């Protein structure tokens, strides 16, 4: 039996995903050791391998088959646009992708004038403005705190993840439009789904059962 490799997005998400996996009998004690310098963790009994990766890299590992399964946020899946199957919503890390800005910017979203949009997610922003709103925009890619952009006049609006909206409010900004809901998803490599169909499908069904019971 070959190993099935699971890539987890580093941070809180990996910790929560491992807790759910434990509920279906999938454990990896090696990963719980905070002093470990290992990059790959193994459960020999279940023939499973785990590794932690930067969120944006998880879809790449899965598309190319370096990982059979990945756990990553929907924001990363949309932004990276990789070829893979999205099979399950884990209902973890729920938040929203939104257009935000000062209240005065709301009207700018309803006429055809060119506006500037600052974001960490240029592909999501481009898709939403061009394909859904049919509005021409200039997209400015930033890596730091996006809320700063409209305050200092770099952009009229921003596209960003909103959890509670309190950071926006503190900076005199608000949600102007919601693009889509976000949460952690399970993704599967297309070839792995065929080659290891039985094992992967069982894992997905067991996870689905646990999630249904928790609701």
UniProtKB/Swiss-Prot annotation:
Catalytic activity as recorded in UniProt: 1-(5-phospho-beta-D-ribosyl)-ATP + diphosphate = 5-phospho-alpha-D-ribose 1-diphosphate + ATP
GO molecular function: ATP binding; ATP phosphoribosyltransferase activity
EC number(s) per entry: 2.4.2.17
Main location: cytoplasm
UniProt key word Protease: no
Gene Ontology cellular component annotations, sorted alphabetically: cytoplasm
Domain of life (superkingdom): Bacteria
PROSITE patterns: ATP_P_PHORIBOSYLTR
Keyword Amino-acid biosynthesis set for record: yes
Gene3D superfamilies, alphabetized: Periplasmic binding protein-like II
Listed pathway(s): Amino-acid biosynthesis; L-histidine biosynthesis; L-histidine from 5-phospho-alpha-D-ribose 1-diphosphate: step 1/9
Pfam families listed in its UniProt record: HisG
Alphabetized UniProt keyword annotations: Amino-acid biosynthesis, ATP-binding, Cytoplasm, Glycosyltransferase, Histidine biosynthesis, Nucleotide-binding, Transferase
CDD domains per the UniProt record, alphabetical: PBP2_HisGs
Domains as described in the record: Lacks the C-terminal regulatory region which is replaced by HisZ.
Family, per entry: Belongs to the ATP phosphoribosyltransferase family. Short subfamily.
Role: Catalyzes the condensation of ATP and 5-phosphoribose 1-diphosphate to form N'-(5'-phosphoribosyl)-ATP (PR-ATP). Has a crucial role in the pathway because the rate of histidine biosynthesis seems to be controlled primarily by regulation of HisG enzymatic activity.
Quaternary data: Heteromultimer composed of HisG and HisZ subunits.
PANTHER family: ATP PHOSPHORIBOSYLTRANSFERASE, ATP PHOSPHORIBOSYLTRANSFERASE ATP-PRTASE
Protein name listed in UniProt: ATP phosphoribosyltransferase
């Amino acid at each position: 039996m070959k190993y099935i490799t699971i890539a987890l997005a580093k941070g809180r998400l990996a910790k929560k995903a491992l807790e759910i996996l434990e509920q279906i009998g999938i454990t990896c004690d090696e990963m719980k050791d905070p002093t470990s310098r290992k990059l790959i963790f193994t459960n020999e009994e279940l023939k499973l391998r785990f590794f932690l990766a930067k969120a944006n890299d998880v879809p790449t590992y899965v598309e190319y088959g370096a990982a059979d399964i990945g756990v990553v946020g929907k924001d990363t899946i949309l932004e990276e646009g990789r070829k893979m199957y999205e099979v399950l919503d884990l209902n973890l890390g729920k938040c929203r992708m939104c257009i935000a800005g000062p209240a005065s910017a709301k009207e700018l979203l309803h006429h055809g004038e060119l506006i500037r949009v600052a974001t960490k997610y240029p592909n999501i922003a481009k898709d939403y403005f061009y394909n859904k709103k049919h509005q021409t925009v200039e997209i400015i890619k930033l890596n730091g705190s996006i809320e700063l952009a409209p305050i200092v006049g770099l952009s009229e609006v921003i596209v960003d993840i909103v959890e509670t909206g309190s950071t926006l409010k503190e900076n005199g900004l608000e949600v102007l439009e919601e693009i889509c809901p976000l949460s952690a998803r399970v993704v599967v490599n297309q070839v792995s789904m065929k080659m290891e169909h039985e094992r992967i499908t069982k894992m997905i069904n067991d996870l689905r059962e646990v999630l249904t019971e928790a609701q």
